Amino acid sequence: MSLASGSRTNTFRPLHTAPQLTTPARADAMEAPVQTLTFQRRQTLYHNGDPAQSVFRVRDGLVRITRMTPEGRILTVRHLVPGDFFGEEAFMDGQREEIAEALTTAQIEAIDPALINQQDLMSITRSLSVQMQRSMEYQYHLQTGDLRQRVARYLLTLADTPLARVDAQGRPVISATHELVAEGTASTRESVSKIITELRAEGLIASGYRSITLVDREELDAVAEGF
């Protein structure tokens, strides 16, 4: 099993303007034995080029899959929520093609592909099918609207994931840097910082050290729609 130093051991609000990271209602129990691993926030699960020896499922937390462009930019290509399977390269005895990183503290189930039976395989197939639809929606939103709209959509998407908490005023507080938002919107940190500054000046968000608070979610939704 090729993992980067792992230790053993919400539902998204419907918004037609933002890609939805819907958590499966329940995760079917695997018949194959699983090994549960715990990863801390921003800890890497595996790197590009690592041997693909296990299939994984998110038990708890939020994980992202990234790729690096020839210019050295990191792009987020996939988000994984509880119940999602990933690491399907293990079925082909290949190498990891991407980087998997825990965005929150996460519990991950590692499964030996040689022990997966037909029932487990159907569960994995259903999960990957749902993720493909989600990925298509995510890519659509990356290619429509200007950067201001894309940033607003991404913040709305992250607001109802394990990456966010609710403050005393009931507002979502997202644990995210400008760099993370840039990687999730196919942009640069400098361009995203300018948009964040504008949204803060308009009173739609508040930003602090590695955090962004959604102050006016309704108006931010309007920005995402292009109004």
Mark where each language-model region is.
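Polybasic "coupling" helices that flank or enter modular domains
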Residues: 121-189
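Cyclic nucleotide-binding regulatory module and flanking cytosolic helices
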Residues: 1-41, 85-86, 90-92
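Cyclic-nucleotide recognition modules
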Residues: 78-133, 137
